[in-house]
């Protein structure tokens, strides 16, 4: 029996990333879940995907009153962990989360207050999440970053982290996705998933670029906007693979779609190491950064539309062992 672990699920992509690890964990494990519609839907409809565990729901610390929400979140996590330590199922010895710096802070020992949480694992693939990095740098014992991490974007986080650093060879999507069979021909009109973001996140205020209205003309659209997706929350990857293309403001959805072989137009100013890696490896990713882009919108959009018909010419991308790596670190065989 391994460490009793508290898993932090802050974003729908994090739920998918950690689901198998949770299934391989202990029945006494705990979940801290961010109360956002997509995360709640995934937990409520997670039979067969995500085991039922004692769960604490916490607010998303963004927008108006974000500091009050953050303080409430830290206090709630402290109480949750303290109660769990007294429930007779063993001490909580490890906390694992993706970008979950506030939980690391809550579980960190102080000179006046010891902590049973000996290991605090901070997983991240988002170099620009500087506020979370600053907290994690002082609170986490381990960090997991990809081999394609761009230190020039991380505000000095990796260079100054004094804990254990693990380098993941692959994207987060390589951990939880399984390649699906793609359509053999392009529909007429092309079937395209479109995802817009609400904004208001910790680090996305300077990254959002509106999707031009003309991008949606003449397409058969499946709407997957943030917090408004009407399909089964666990089947979004199937939707991505079964469509001809994707247009999105979300870097996470873009990365998952192209790993599944679906041509994707990312409309965003965001810079990430994993986006650079996908481009180097020839993934069907088309990027438009808005008015600041050196290329015309019409040219990028035309390339995307042409790319919908060229997926047969793509070589199958290699699938690195990121899943096995993460499992070995967090759920090693007894």
Residue positions per predicted region:
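Structural motif
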Residues: 4-5, 91-94, 191, 244-245
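Active-site and donor-binding regions of nucleotide-sugar-utilizing enzymes
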Residues: 6-20, 35-158
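Catalytic donor nucleotide-activated moiety binding site of glycosyltransferases and closely related
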Residues: 35-37, 44-64, 68, 194-197, ...
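A nucleotide-sugar donor-handling region in carbohydrate enzymes
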Residues: 140-204
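C-terminal amphipathic helix plus adjacent low-complexity
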Residues: 305-334
